[in-house]
């Protein structure tokens, strides 16, 4: 079909006059092939992260529910990112201040979204994970009664998509999981003690197969909630006044259980109260040696307890009963050896609990394990994932923004899809075919224009740049999935509602005024999902003429560690359509990624529909601040065409009511009128278009040679004739 469209455009261009060519160059013309078909957009592609550390006041209010409902979410990722690796959903049910699992179930139900759950890989067992699947999905009366007791709902929640942990190949996850990752990671001990190198091949193997590990020493802080204390791999506790009275204390280590036997634990009891003010000042003055100094202070020889002074108990906790009495606020560090099941065992237990669920792994096994680790391929055949998890955050947007390369930021989405996602999926398909396992899809469960963290973030990211990028990411993923370019199982924007303006969120909550404010990202998402959120047309069912080309710059890195800035051409407009055949409305979405020019748009109604008198137009635009605006207007029907101007860096939607035509499109495929449609008809028609005079190009005889004529041309050989 795409070849046909290109040929039609070429033939049309040959026959058109110079005046018409000038008109086409100034206006982008869009039409649809008659008798087009709709493609359903999966709910799982319309996802948003709404994390469990959200204050309940942010989400439990009518304004937020209305805003959330307006974007038509398909899934809500819960409980979150890094901290989800050790999230205790049962304990958090007692926390009425935050969005716990009970409140999340109610919130998802109120906006008609499914929950996409991130399992606490860092602390769970296969049995616990399977129990949660049963609790949320099993219709058995036993689980129905438990749901009623815990969540005030008896029907199954129906959680289909499950992630086994979050970013566990990363070095910033060691404080939330029994094992994490990082390239060239060293675990450090006391000064002058040789550090332990933990290569990715080792940590990835532990992640999948499980095994024994010592939680001992410390790892460098790497952000995402790590500090000088939790970056120590052991568990630190302070003795209480009651512990002092009792002369002993019991500690349940964070990533236990401890393997039985005192040889599997090392306990340090600091012999004096630590001056935390002095420690803080030392870290401010000497940050590069701060962690080492703190560990040396705690794990000093005089603080080491004799194995007779503690007992590893049957449940994997430890009882400490030192001969030197405990005192209040005494710092205790327990280092320990523990055993954990890996992703394979957890996945298998969950699949037994509910074979219909889809489970994703968060570490790409092809990098260090496939065809390399003993037994890995065989085990992967037994325990394959349904999808691999990807978090496509950008790392060069500030550079582009500082130099005014704004269109380039928008086209990062193209680069992700065509240069990363499609090749990655093609590689996965090859692996799956070789192993004879079902195809593995992709899950893009966190993404945004920029992840700013707690630091300053350019205000433009909260304005139209963030909105337009969000619109590009959602819509391009929808279209890639519809056109069978990608198998996307999940796509979740990061994130939902939060306070402050440094992180990039859909909505901001003002704690002073207790109000909810939309952002350009939430408005863009609403507009996209109103038009193509549930169904859309395939790319080949649109006829697009004169999509303006932008000359863009990109940095290319070469194998010899050199780089260069090169130029390339890209279409300025992203164009998507849907046909609401229930309400008889044609929908058009235009993303103008051009950072310097507005562009004129003309949309022609297919010949099998009669357009309404006017159509509804909405435009989201803004400048390089956090300020943005939406403007609504109506566009008049002129000969079944609708025209408007899309401002630079804008999101536009056009909703056109129509009446199905009582007469079908003209059928002239039997061009030579010999009673049959044959190749000769096509050749005769091409000859007609290629002549130098008397060309029949105005096929609908309306006095103009427009896209509608090409549509009739298309019905001759590409469309259906009744």
Residue ranges and their predicted role:
Residues 634-662:
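C-terminal beta-strand-rich structural cap/linker in extracellular carbohydrate-active enzymes
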Residues 135-136, 199, 204-218, 222-235, ...:
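Noncatalytic carbohydrate-binding groove/subsite architecture in carbohydrate-active enzymes
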Residues 562-611, 649-655:
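Carbohydrate-binding surface patches
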Residues 60-84, 103-107, 111:
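Catalytic domains of carbohydrate-active enzymes, especially glycoside hydrolases
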Residues 187, 191-338:
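Extended beta-strand solenoid/passenger and fiber regions
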Residues 443-573:
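Aromatic/acidic polysaccharide-binding cleft in carbohydrate-active enzymes
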Residues 661-722:
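Cellulosome-associated attachment modules in secreted, modular CAZymes
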Residues 143-199, 205-212, 391-394, 438-450:
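Active-site groove signature of glycoside hydrolases
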């Amino acid at each position: 079909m795409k070849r046909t469209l290109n040929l039609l455009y070429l033939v049309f261009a040959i026959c058109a006059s110079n005046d018409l060519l000038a008109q086409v160059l100034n206006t982008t013309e869009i039409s649809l092939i008659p008798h087009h078909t709709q493609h359903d957009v999966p709910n799982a592609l319309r996802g948003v992260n709404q994390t469990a550390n959200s204050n309940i006041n942010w989400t439990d209010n009518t304004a937020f529910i209305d805003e959330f409902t307006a974007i038509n979410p398909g899934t809500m990722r819960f409980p979150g990112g890094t901290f989800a690796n050790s999230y205790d959903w049962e304990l958090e049910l007692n926390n009425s201040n935050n969005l716990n699992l009970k409140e999340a179930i109610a919130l998802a139900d109120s906006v008609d979204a499914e929950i996409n759950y991130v399992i606490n890989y860092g602390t769970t067992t296969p049995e616990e994970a399977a129990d949660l699947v049963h609790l949320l999905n099993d219709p058995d009366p036993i689980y129905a009664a438990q749901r009623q007791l815990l969540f005030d709902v008896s029907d199954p929640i129906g959680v289909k998509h499950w992630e086994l942990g979050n970013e566990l190949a990363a070095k910033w996850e060691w404080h939330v999981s029994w094992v994490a990752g990082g390239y060239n990671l060293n675990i450090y001990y006391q000064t002058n003690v040789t550090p332990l190198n933990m290569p990715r091949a080792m940590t990835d193997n532990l992640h999948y197969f499980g095994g024994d590990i010592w939680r001992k020493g410390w790892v460098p802080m790497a952000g995402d909630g790590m500090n000088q204390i939790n970056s120590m791999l052991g568990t630190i506790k302070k003795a209480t006044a009651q512990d002092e009275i009792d002369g002993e204390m019991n500690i349940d280590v964070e990533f236990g259980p401890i393997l039985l036997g005192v040889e599997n634990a090392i306990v340090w009891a600091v012999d004096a109260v630590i001056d935390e003010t002095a420690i803080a000042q030392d870290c401010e003055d000497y940050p590069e040696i701060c962690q080492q100094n703190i560990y040396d202070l705690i794990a000093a020889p005089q603080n080491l307890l004799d194995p007779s002074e503690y007992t590893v108990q049957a449940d994997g906790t430890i009882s400490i009963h030192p001969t030197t009495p405990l005192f209040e606020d005494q710092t205790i560090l327990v280092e320990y050896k523990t055993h954990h099941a890996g992703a394979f065992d957890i996945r298998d237990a969950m699949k037994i609990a509910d074979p219909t669920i889809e489970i994703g792994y968060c570490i790409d096994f092809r990098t260090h394990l496939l065809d390399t680790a003993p037994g890995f391929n065989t085990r992967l055949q037994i325990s394959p994932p349904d999808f691999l998890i990807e978090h496509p955050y950008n790392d060069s947007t500030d550079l582009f923004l500082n130099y005014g390369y704004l269109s380039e930021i928008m086209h990062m989405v193209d680069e992700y899809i065509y240069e990363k996602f499609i090749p990655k999926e093609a590689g996965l398909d090859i692996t799956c075919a070789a192993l004879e396992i079902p195809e593995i899809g992709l899950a893009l469960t966190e993404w945004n224009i920029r992840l700013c963290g707690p630091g300053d973030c350019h205000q433009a990211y909260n304005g139209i740049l963030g909105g337009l990028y969000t619109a590009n990411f959602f819509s391009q993923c929808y279209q890639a999935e519809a056109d069978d370019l990608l198998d996307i199982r999940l796509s979740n924007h990061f994130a939902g509602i939060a306070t402050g303006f440094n992180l990039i969120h859909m909505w901001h909550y003002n704690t002073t005024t207790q109000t909810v404010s939309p952002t350009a990202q939430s408005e863009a998402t609403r507009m996209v999902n109103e038009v193509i959120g549930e169904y859309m047309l395939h790319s080949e069912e649109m006829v697009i003429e004169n999509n303006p080309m932008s000359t863009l710059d990109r940095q290319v890195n070469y194998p010899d560690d050199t780089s260069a800035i090169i130029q390339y051409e890209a279409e300025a407009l992203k164009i998507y359509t849907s046909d609401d055949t229930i309400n008889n409305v044609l929908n058009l979405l235009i993303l103008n990624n051009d950072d310097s020019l507005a562009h004129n748009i003309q949309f022609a109604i297919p010949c099998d529909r009669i357009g309404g008198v006017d159509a509804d137009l909405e435009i989201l635009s803004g400048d390089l601040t956090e300020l943005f605006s939406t403007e609504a207007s109506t566009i008049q029907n002129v000969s079944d065409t609708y025209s408007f101007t899309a401002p630079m860096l804008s999101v536009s939607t056009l909703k056109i009511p129509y009446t199905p035509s009582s007469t079908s499109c003209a059928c002239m495929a039997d061009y030579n009128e010999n009673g049959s449609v044959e190749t000769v008809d096509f050749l005769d028609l091409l000859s007609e278009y290629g002549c130098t005079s008397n060309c029949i190009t105005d096929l609908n005889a309306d006095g103009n040679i427009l896209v509608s004529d090409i549509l009739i041309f298309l019905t001759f050989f590409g469309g259906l004739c009744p």
